[in-house]
Amino acid sequence: MTQAFMSYEELLERAYSMLPRRRRRSTGERFVLPTFEVSKTGKKVYIHNFKDVAEKLNREPPVLLRFILKEIALPGVYENGTAVIHGEVSAQTLNKLLERFYNEYVKCPVCEAPDTILVKEKKLMYIKCTACGAVSPVKPF
């Protein structure tokens, strides 16, 4: 049995060749943040694609709605895949809140992947990333 000795540089090069190539992720290469489809009737605002947006963010619709309603300080309900807000709020404001929710409660702060789970233990909330395994605390709402 003969043993071939490799230099440190050769071993290092071999190890690097076995690692998966790391891609640079540009904003939106893999995940595109959806926008709300909003209509107004009187003093009510309807978000028609609310369930679809919540599913794309991997969050329950009532959780997303609770965040939005607390931020705009208006009452509202979720029914049949549509969110109904009782009050006047612009589509631009709602989409900015959606972007803020994504940055604070969906996107992993370590690897910036959108593949996360929101975990609530007692009074604490965490984001657990399914891509890198990181667990990061977030401000409860």
Swiss-Prot record:
Source species: Thermofilum pendens (strain DSM 2475 / Hrk 5)
TM region(s), chain numbering: none
Role according to the record: eIF-2 functions in the early steps of protein synthesis by forming a ternary complex with GTP and initiator tRNA.
Coiled coil ranges: none
Protein name per the record: Translation initiation factor 2 subunit beta
NCBIfam families xref list: PRK03988.1
Gene Ontology MF, one: translation initiation factor activity
Keywords: Initiation factor, Protein biosynthesis
Family: Belongs to the eIF-2-beta/eIF-5 family.
Subunit text: Heterotrimer composed of an alpha, a beta and a gamma chain.
Highest taxon, organism lineage: Archaea
InterPro entries: IF2/IF5, TIF2_bsu_arc, Transl_init_fac_IF2/IF5_dom, Transl_init_fac_IF2/IF5_N, Transl_init_fac_IF2/IF5_Zn-bd
PANTHER family linked to this entry: EUKARYOTIC TRANSLATION INITIATION FACTOR, EUKARYOTIC TRANSLATION INITIATION FACTOR 2 SUBUNIT 2
Pfam families: eIF-5_eIF-2B
